Amino acid sequence: MKKLLIIGASLLQLPAIKKAKEMGLYVAVVDYNPNAVGIKYADEYFNASTMDEDAVLKVAQDFKPDGIMTLATDMPMRGVAKVSDNLGLNSISYETAVKATDKYEMIKAFEEHNVPAPWFYLVKNYEELLTLQDKITFPCIMKPTDNAGSHGVVKIHSYEELLNNYEYSHNNSRHGNVIVEEYLDGPEVSVEIMVTNGDVNVLQITDKLTTEAPYFVEMGHSQPSRLDIITQNQIKDVATKACKAVGINKGPAHVEMKITSKNGPKMIELGARMGGDNITTHLVPLSTGIDMVECTIKTALGETIDVTPTLNCGSAIRYFEVPFGKIKSIEGVEEAMKIEGVRQISFTKDIGEESIPIHCSNDRIGFVIAQAGNAEEAIKICEKVKEIIIINTTLV
């Protein structure tokens, strides 16, 4: 029986843990939280931080897996790559993992390989921030170099705002570094990818719905993209170049970019892992029939994968928007689940918990996923569900 080590045992890793067990693998998980939801589904549990590369390596040396992986999380990829380098497993290199998890190293790689991307400045402290007054134009974006899920990302309209928001971005960075970069105006998309032997296979392009400035939190996704075919081909070209620039030669990739009116697609960032927000675990298989979780597991084990689509459908997810306050009741779920095409309705906060302003992805309270003949119909189903479900709140 082959052994798979999964870094993390949270809700994000649950699809991988369950799929690996379905595939007949012996599964061990690593997580600092002994109560993580995925532990009970695994065969073995190791208590260690997913961010502690040396601890993850020690676990791997003891467990001796045939493959190692993580789903939809950035920083644990460093541990995955370190183990792979040391034990000769099938993953990206540590150098690539750093480029894919440090936004400064990433955008430098884009610049070096002529990948369309924003202008940028690395800021290590407040004194360096003060030197940017005559170098940048507004609006611009300020964000941590080493975080995800929109944490610490803010749109800046003036030099005064730049100074006032520095602490917000700085405090969301693990190492204190932030990037100030060009603001890209236009629709946002992500590209869902599996790389096999250096070949970049674009499985799907995802249209995105985000909150307005300054935080740009993702509130919806749909597939396939409804952009014109010429633009889609440009998107695929930029995504391919971006993956090659950071050195992703195997496994999944999640590439984010905006379609600017003047210069076409320009990179925001990428991850050398599957996309989160249910995009790759749910939307891709619902729209294409391709099981990216299984493909990622097989890649980690060094096995051959098939990325041929077996479906041509539309899929969508929409997150609920509710009044701020303590959640009093949630009504209409049973009725909504009866709607044709609804595949899942989930809530990440319970009755009695607080709904707060959405500044990052963790602030969202739940979502609906739908499947239909095309993306537009899938979106309509999601919006209908949002009308039926009533989430009552009371002021705190």
Can you name each region flagged by the protein language model?
Residues S150, G271-S287, I351:
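Glycine-rich phosphate/pyrophosphate-binding beta-alpha loops
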Residues H157-S158, I193, F320-P323, V368-G373:
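Short beta-strand-to-loop capping motifs
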Residues S169-N177, E182-S225, N233-M267, G271-T280, ...:
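Phosphate-binding core of ATP-grasp and ATP-grasp-like enzymes
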Residues K266-M267, K338-E354:
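A structural supersecondary motif
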Residues T304-G341:
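A glycine-rich beta-turn/hairpin centered on an aromatic-Pro dipeptide
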